[in-house]
A protein has these predicted regions:
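Bacterial N-terminal signal peptides
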Residues: 25-36
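Bacterial N-terminal signal peptides that target proteins for export
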Residues: 13-27
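Long, contiguous binding/interaction regions
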Residues: 42-142, 149-285, 289-314
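Sec/Tat signal peptide C-region and signal peptidase I cleavage site
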Residues: 37-41
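Short, Lys/Arg-enriched N-terminal segments with co-localized hydrophobic residues
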Residues: 2-14
Length: 314
C-alpha cells in the first residue's frame, strides 16, 4: 500500500509539471500573439482622416484624435441670449485607434429639419445613433443634438460621417477667421477661484473647465476617455455688465443625479435635460445639462456645490 501511494504521488508530480509546462506555453503564445497584433497594427493616419472629413483635428490625451465642427453658420438665442458656437453649438468627432480598428463617437448639432437626413446618412455609412435630444430649452431656432458611434477603419468612418453631414449645413473645410474685438471679456480668475480648478480660454469670450470622472469608464471592455466626451464640461460665455451665461453637462452615475440637480437648483441654476448619450457604457452614465445667467463668481460657486456631489477627479 505504501509503494502504491508513492507511485501515485510520483505520477501526480509528473502530471503537475506537464500541466505547468502546457500553461506556460499557452501564456507565452498568447503574449506573442498580443504583441504581434499590436506590433502589426498600422499607426493611424490622422492626416487622411482630416482629408476624408474635411476638417482639421488635434491629438488629445489618451491618443484621442478629436475634430471640432462648430455650427458657426447658426445664430441661436437661448432665452434671448445670443450663444456662441464654441459655447453651446459644438459638433465633434472623437477617434481612437485600438489595434487594427478605430472607434469614433461624438455629437452633432442639428436644426430640426436636418435630423432625419443626417440620421439616415449615418445608418447608410454603417454608424449607429445612440441618442437624439435637446440640451437646452427656449432655443431659437430650435436645435437638437444627435450622438453617434462607429467602429472600423478610421478613414472610412470619417468619410461616412462627412456623407451624413452633407444632409446638414454644418460648415466643413478650413475654419473661418475668428472675429476680433466686440466680445466682452470674461473674468477667468473669478471662475477658477470659485471652482478651485483651472480652465482654458476658447476665445470669443468663452471659457471652459473640464472635469474628468475619477473611475474608469468602459464600453464592451474598451476605455472611454475624457477627450471622447466622457467628462463634465462647464462652459462660461461673457455677457455685458460683467455677467456670464453657463451651460454644459455633468457626467453622472445614477445615485448622483438627484443630489447634483438639487445643488444646482439651490443655486438658481436651471436643469434643462437629463439623459444618456451612449448605450453600453459601464458604469451607466447620465448627462445633466444646465443654464443660468449671473456673475461668474456666483455661477462658479453653484457649479462647485454640484461638483462636490460627484466622484470627479480632484
Amino acid at each position: 500500500m505504501v509503494a502504491g501511494r508513492a507511485g501515485s504521488e510520483r505520477m501526480g508530480d509528473i502530471m503537475r509539471v506537464r500541466i505547468h509546462d502546457v500553461s506556460l506555453h499557452v501564456a507565452v503564445l498568447a503574449g506573442c500573439l498580443l504583441f504581434g497584433s499590436r506590433a502589426g497594427a498600422a499607426e493611424p493616419d490622422w492626416k487622411a482622416v482630416e482629408q476624408a472629413l474635411g476638417k482639421p483635428g488635434q491629438v488629445q490625451a489618451g491618443d484621442v484624435f478629436r475634430v471640432g465642427m462648430p455650427r458657426t453658420d447658426l445664430s441661436v438665442n437661448v432665452k434671448g441670449v445670443p450663444v456662441k458656437a464654441g459655447f453651446a453649438l459644438g459638433s465633434y468627432a472623437a477617434f481612437r485607434q485600438v489595434g487594427d480598428r478605430a472607434m469614433v463617437m461624438g455629437d452633432l448639432v442639428l436644426l430640426d429639419q436636418e435630423v432625419p437626413g443626417v440620421m439616415s446618412g449615418l445608418f447608410s455609412g454603417g454608424l449607429e445613433v445612440t441618442a437624439v435630444h435637446n440640451h437646452l430649452n427656449e432655443m431659437s431656432p430650435h436645435v437638437m443634438y444627435m450622438h453617434y458611434e462607429g467602429h472600423g477603419d478610421a478613414v472610412q468612418l470619417a468619410r461616412a460621417l462627412r456623407q451624413a453631414l452633407a444632409a446638414s449645413a454644418t460648415p466643413l473645410g478650413a475654419p473661418a477667421a475668428a472675429a476680433t474685438g466686440g466680445a466682452p471679456a470674461i473674468d477667468a480668475k473669478q471662475i477658477e477661484q470659485a471652482l478651485g480648478r483651472a480652465g482654458r480660454d476658447l476665445g470669443n469670450g468663452v471659457f471652459q473647465v473640464t472635469v474628468p470622472r475619477a473611475e474608469a469608464i468602459t464600453e464592451n471592455g474598451m476605455p472611454l476617455l475624457p477627450a471622447m466626451g466622457i467628462a463634465t464640461v462647464l462652459n462660461f460665455q461673457a455677457l455685458d455688465g460683467g455677467r456670464a451665461a453657463i451651460t454644459g453637462d455633468f457626467v453622472l452615475i445614477d445615485r448622483e443625479v438627484n443630489p447634483v440637480a438639487r445643488a444646482l437648483r439651490q443655486h438658481g441654476i436651471d436643469v434643462t435635460a437629463i439623459h444618456n448619450h451612449g448605450l453600453l457604457d459601464t458604469p451607466r452614465l447620465f448627462y445633466m445639462h444646465f443654464w443660468a445667467v449671473d456673475s461668474p463668481a456666483t455661477l462658479g460657486q453653484g457649479l462647485k456645490a454640484a461638483l462636490d456631489q460627484t466622484n470627479s477627479q480632484r
